[in-house]
């Protein structure tokens, strides 16, 4: 994997920094694991905008990823690594001994030809998936379930990982990248190793159009709007907003805590540090 800084042949190329991975498959994805992905433009079924800054972008197929890793005891071979436009991580196409193919998240160091397996008897090796009760304390894992059998929810983006710091009874304690310490049932599965493509954070798109290719529309500042559109809007000339930062609906923002799910607070041993 290489980090390439483009030559400034035009203003739009001047700031571009690309991540080039020669190990990625250059052909089409495996057709049997693709699904239709329709554009919403950020609108719901009534036509109202429910998610701002969404619209346009290149047409994409969704890749069906195996987040459950429930094909126990059947060894699989990594056929190839692929780019996935739907996530920051790369994905790996696995061919299992029974002939089935599945996509999984590509772990750091994973290459074509590697063997992976899941289940309670799997070796402690990068890419293998096991229940947390069978993973040694101190191990680094990714793609962690929060409920047994539901599928991975924690640490799925590029470069992400969590560490198993303790195991007590029916719960394992995990340290997340944010600094949060969280309890998860020991029957939940996790995949050993870190998610690959950690260099993703170093890329620079270089121009606004590259964001538009990805389906991201511009973000307009509240102080640039009219009073009818935003609490910060209006005023003669340029103003600073005149109040603490709020969303277009008047809810405080920029650091204001909105978590109110007290039902699951008991699973958080220590809140995140930021």
Curated annotation (Swiss-Prot):
Name used for this protein in its record: Large ribosomal subunit protein uL2
Family affiliation: Belongs to the universal ribosomal protein uL2 family.
Pfam family, one: Ribosomal_L2
Species: Shewanella amazonensis (strain ATCC BAA-1098 / SB2B)
NCBIfam families: rplB_bact
InterPro entries to which the protein is assigned, alphabetical: NA-bd_OB-fold, Rib_uL2_dom2, Ribosomal_uL2, Ribosomal_uL2_bac/org-type, Ribosomal_uL2_C, Ribosomal_uL2_CS, Ribosomal_uL2_dom3, Ribosomal_uL2_RNA-bd_dom
Record key words, sorted: Ribonucleoprotein, Ribosomal protein, RNA-binding, rRNA-binding
Assembly description: Part of the 50S ribosomal subunit. Forms a bridge to the 30S subunit in the 70S ribosome.
């Amino acid at each position: 994997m290489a980090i390439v800084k483009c030559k400034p042949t035009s203003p739009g190329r001047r700031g571009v920094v690309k991540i080039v991975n020669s190990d990625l498959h250059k052909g089409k994805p495996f057709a049997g694991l693709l699904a239709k992905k329709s554009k919403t433009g950020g609108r719901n079924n009534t036509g109202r905008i429910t998610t701002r800054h969404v619209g346009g972008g290149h047409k994409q197929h969704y890749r069906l990823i195996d987040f459950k890793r429930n094909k126990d005891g059947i060894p699989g071979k990594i056929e190839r690594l692929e780019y996935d436009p739907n996530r920051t991580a790369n994905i790996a196409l696995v061919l299992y001994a029974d002939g089935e193919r599945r996509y999984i998240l590509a772990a750091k160091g994973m290459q074509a030809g590697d063997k992976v397996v899941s289940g309670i008897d799997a070796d402690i090796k990068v890419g293998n998936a096991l229940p947390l009760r069978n993973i040694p304390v101190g191990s680094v894992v990714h793609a962690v379930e929060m409920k047994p059998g539901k599928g991975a929810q924690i640490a799925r983006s590029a470069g992400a990982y969590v560490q198993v710091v303790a195991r007590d009874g029916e719960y394992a304690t995990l340290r997340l990248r944010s600094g949060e310490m969280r309890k998860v049932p020991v029957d939940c599965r996790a995949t050993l190793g870190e998610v690959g493509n950690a260099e993703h954070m170093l890329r620079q798109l270089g121009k606004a159009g590259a964001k538009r290719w990805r389906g991201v529309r511009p973000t307009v500042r509240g102080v640039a709007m009219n009073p009818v559109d935003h609490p910060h809007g209006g005023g003669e000339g340029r103003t600073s907003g005149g109040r603490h930062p709020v969303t277009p609906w008047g809810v405080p923002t920029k650091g204001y805590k909105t978590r109110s799910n007290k039902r699951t607070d008991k699973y958080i041993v220590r809140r995140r540090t930021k």
